[in-house]
Amino acid sequence: MGLKKFFKIKPPEEATPEQNKDTLMELGISVKNPSKKRKEKFAAYGKFANDKAEDKVYAPPGYEQYARPQDELEDLNASPLDANANEATAGSNRGSSGTQDLGNGAESNSMQDPYAIENDDYRYDDDPYARFQANKSNGRGSVNAAPYGDYGGGYNGTSLNSYNNDGPYSNQNTSNSWVNANGRNSLNHSNSTLNVGPSRQTRQPPVSTSTNSLSLDQRSPLANPMQEKRNPYADMNSYGGAYDSNTNRSSGTRQGSSKNANPYASMANDSYSNGNLNRSANPYSSRSVRQPQSQQAPMTYTPSFIASDEAARNSEVDLNEEPRTGEFDFEEVYADKSAENRAALDEPDLNAVMTNEDSIDLNASEVDHSSRQQQQQQWFMDEQQQQQQHFNATNNQYGDQRGYKTFEEIQKEEEARQQQEEDEAVDEIKQEIKFTKQSSVASTRNTLKMAQDAERAGMNTLGMLGHQSEQLNNVEGNLDLMKVQNKVADEKVAELKKLNRSILAVHVSNPFNSKRRRREREEQLKNRKIEEKLMREQTSQQLSQSTQRIEGAMNANNNISEVRERYQRKNVLEKAKRYQFENDEEDDEMELEIDRNLDQIQQVSNRLKKMALTTGKELDSQQKRLNNIEESTDDLDINLHMNTNRLAGIR
């Protein structure tokens, strides 16, 4: 049984970090002040470096998901009806992909409750698919309207669905005011349906039927009508009649063209002619009742012999027949024009009465004869002048039509040709000079842009090196504190070892050298404080030098003053005259821009050189600091290991 247990001696309580810090401060030992924060000049570049950093992992193909932390597993017990189900789903989607589809997000936020009571009653709807189109609507306010509803018949047609169902399976037939008796408009067939079987024979007011409709009715009524193409304009003849393919004549009573006439009516035998387009009715509808419409012609059947008699009777044309109302008459239209264009003959009119103007007045005076003679001379001179002008123009153009040219004419032509060639050569040189200048301007712009990009990258590199230097300074300061406190720990371990000796080993200090020991102790504390201060100053000096280097490289912009640029403009224009030919304002601007860009490129190049040198020096300095940090860390690690072993050996 030990003495400690016998006297019930307990070990002292472990001191907290705050108590330990206060104790060290009372003893005069340096500690770290957490409230003191150094101002960092390059903290923004540190944030920039963190944003640009990439977490690169290495994994074989197909195993990339194991190199990253697994996402949260989906809750299998989650229900769409939960309050936070949509938010959790959206959050997981954002976490996995980083983006969210707007369309899918809208659907997920508006999920339908399968247990909710339906507000719309579809029990009496003929269309079983109408509920899936309840949210759609065309421009006319129908609930289940088709998006491509009939164009011209939505307001004058008759709806056959008692519940106003205008869906794609409804039997609603609409009419259009533009359709003819035997045709349907192509814009009015989206929702119209026809019976597959033979149509009902109904009586309608007499309308003009075409031969095309007869030929269509002679077909088998049970044939598949969907195999034939449909021309929406086949039955709408501009003259009210139809075209007979056998006689190549228009049959029926011709009528005057109106504003509603169809210009495509002659295309009756086109491969896209209007067939009997049949569409099946809605198989789910029980109220599909077909009602006759006043504007649609009945589909009647006419025997072939009656059709041939009508065609033969219509083919006979009476040449003496008077033109009908509204019919185009060629003679009436072009009679006046032919009369106007008919040139009058120069033959004399033998029945015309002779006047005094055509005869010579023998009793006229000499004055009248002289005036008449002067007038004739004037006419003759004008005629000669016109002939001379025409003659000169002909000589200039065709060399007098003599078959040869004079020496003067040849010399003039040669001079004109040489002048033209010289002008063309000068213009070509001008264009080459202008093109070269434009190319030079573009080249200087591109070079300046690339130089500025390189300068920006260099500044970013220097900024990140500055932030790295600040972080290294923090590490060095912490290592200095660790060195000082580790020395204090060595002394405390030695003192503890001395106090933990055997109780029989009495240690008594020499009373005659107490003053000397006190002086040694004071010198030791003083030297320790000086050493600590020197380490701190050295660390701060390294940071200051690094900051000055980086700031000097980043602040060297060398901005050009306006006064210098104004005086430099004159010098540039004077030097540019050697390379200019008939220069204008545009040429001067290009010369100035070229000189300005070259000057800026030179300045950027100088700054890039300075940045490169500064970067090299900074890297060397930080490399030395890193080596010192490595050595200091190794020494501290060894000292801590030794103190730990010493403490373990004290019993």
From Swiss-Prot:
GO CC, one annotated term: cytosol
Chain segments carrying region Disordered = 1-22, 53-299, 313-332
Where do Low complexity bias regions lie? 285-296
User: How the protein assembles, per its UniProt entry?
Assistant: Interacts with SRO7 and SRO77.
List, as start-end ranges, the regions of compositional bias called Basic and acidic residues.
Answer: 120-129, 313-327
Which key words tag this protein in UniProt? Coiled coil, Phosphoprotein, Protein transport, Repeat, Transport
Xref: PANTHER family? SYNAPTOSOMAL ASSOCIATED PROTEIN (PTHR19305), SYNAPTOSOMAL-ASSOCIATED PROTEIN 29 (PTHR19305:SF9)
Q: What does this protein do?
A: Component of a SNARE complex that may be the effector of SEC4 function in exocytosis.
Q: Which InterPro entries match?
A: T_SNARE_dom
**Superkingdom in the source lineage:** Eukaryota
* Polar residues bias: start-end ranges: 86-112, 157-218, 244-284
Gene Ontology terms: biological process: exocytosis; Golgi to plasma membrane transport; Golgi vesicle fusion to target membrane; intracellular protein transport; SNARE complex assembly; vesicle fusion; vesicle fusion to plasma membrane
Taxonomic lineage is:
Eukaryota, Fungi, Dikarya, Ascomycota, Saccharomycotina
The entry assigns this protein to a family as follows: Belongs to the SNAP-25 family.
Instruction: Give all Phosphothreonine modified positions.
Output: 355
Gene giving rise to this polypeptide: SEC9
Signal peptide limits: none
Query: What is the name attached to this protein's record?
Result: Protein transport protein SEC9
Q: Which GO terms describe its molecular function?
A: SNAP receptor activity; SNARE binding; syntaxin binding
Start and end of every t-SNARE coiled-coil homology domain?
434-496, 588-650
Q: Which residues carry this modification: Phosphoserine?
A: 79, 92, 186, 190, 213, 271, 273, 315, 359
